[in-house]
């Protein structure tokens, strides 16, 4: 995520995450595996949790969101959206048996999800978690690609290949920007043209921001 690592090692690390920590059977993303319970190692307070709970081998949702962000930055759309579906709490309440297992509200983010029997898939803390803010950033900034920079918006999405278009209504102080992003198919993630109010502005994906108290209609073409 910091872009500070070697690209090849980053891909190897994320491949290991996918292989070792993504639990498709339980629809969760573990923080680590195996848990600290049978060794002399002392990693700190996390060893105080029973195996599979919170940071000791459960899903710690902050890290799960960061992992999903990392897959998006690597351009792995399929993996990104698969993990996003795991993170989305609404999917925990899609069936009565899933809700019975989850036991907490399916409309807010849970700080953690248990990763060991007999409580695998049970939600932990809700409401009181910064994971909600990170989920918002993943959804808006990384997936939809709406990134606020100094003086402008940058559009750099990671959306499924079968999306034809999507819209974002963005309010900048007293000015409204109605943005339609048109996708160009299989590898569409780079803006090729930005048009505002019928005038072509650039081919960089940048939308200049000006608080003129007007409504602007923006079209962004991706390839």
Could you say what each language-model-derived stretch is?
Residues 1-223:
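Acidic, mature catalytic/reactive cores of soluble proteins
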